[in-house]
Amino acid sequence: MSSENAAASATPARTFGFVSVLVIGILAATQSADPGITSVAMPSIAKDLGFSGAGLSLAVSIGTLSLAATVIAIGALADRIGVRRVIMIGLVLEALGNLIVAVSPSLAVLLLGRVVAGVGMGALFAGAFSMVPAIAGKRTIAAVIGQWTGLLYIFTIIFSIIGSALIGISWRAGFILIPVVCLIMMLVVPKTLPETPRRGSSKFDFLGLSTLGLGMVLVLVAVSLAATSLGSPTFWICLIIGIIMLGLFAVIEKKSPNAAFPIELFKSPVFVAAVL
């Protein structure tokens, strides 16, 4: 075993206390507060940048769409490089995405920023949740999740209040809060969170995850269009191609020896009931 893998395996044996739980609570709260801050700022953004209707709807939802489309891929990446590294990547992406939004001169740049931030949000929330067993130690996982959830709610409220106050000054100022928090967390995370063991031998299921991501994005776009554009060609094109891509994902995962998602889980009534 290499010294790097030995260190990674030994790290979780350390004891991590309340500070570590506090950190993952703050990490998850950045993801939780971000969409709310965006929604509060959106009327001012739309007026300033001159868009409405479909553009406004897409600007509000595209961050969540990119989060949903990449969350499984993020889990697969964490298996390869470790959860803490995924969290650090998420911090960089969410900070960068919000900064792009803060300086955006047009709807296109704004959407780019929201996509980048959405991927970062997915990495942070998934990473924070995945850290719970690593920092639980002698405590029960349920107890740590209880503390984490409480801190998540508290800091979501705090960040939302501060973000809304900054938006009252300028909507661009509202998007500076999350990058500042992310920058602080970049300094704190390496000192307070353990690195998790990595499965470096597994191959990355790029084809399967790509079809899943594209399929989820198209279906979610179709759902967002359903309320106002049920009869439009765009709605049906997104829906049909999205369903085809999800079906292709299922076929790929069933045949792949390195499947990112065990498709056989859907044979379990308990799993299906939990998902629904």
Q: What are these model-predicted stretches?
A:
Residues 18-25, 37, 107-115, 275:
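The feature captures the transmembrane alpha-helix scaffold of multi-pass secondary transporters
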Residues 75-206:
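Helix-loop-helix hairpins in multi-pass membrane proteins, especially solute transporters
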Residues 36, 67-72, 156-157:
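Residue-level signature of mid-helix packing/kink "hotspots" within the transmembrane helices
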Residues 164-276:
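Hydrophobic transmembrane-helix bundles of small-molecule transporters
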Residues 16-56, 60-61, 71:
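Extracytoplasmic
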Residues 59-67, 152:
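Transmembrane alpha-helical segments of major facilitator superfamily
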Residues 29, 65, 99-100, 115, ...:
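Hydrophobic residues within the alpha-helical transmembrane core of Major Facilitator Superfamily
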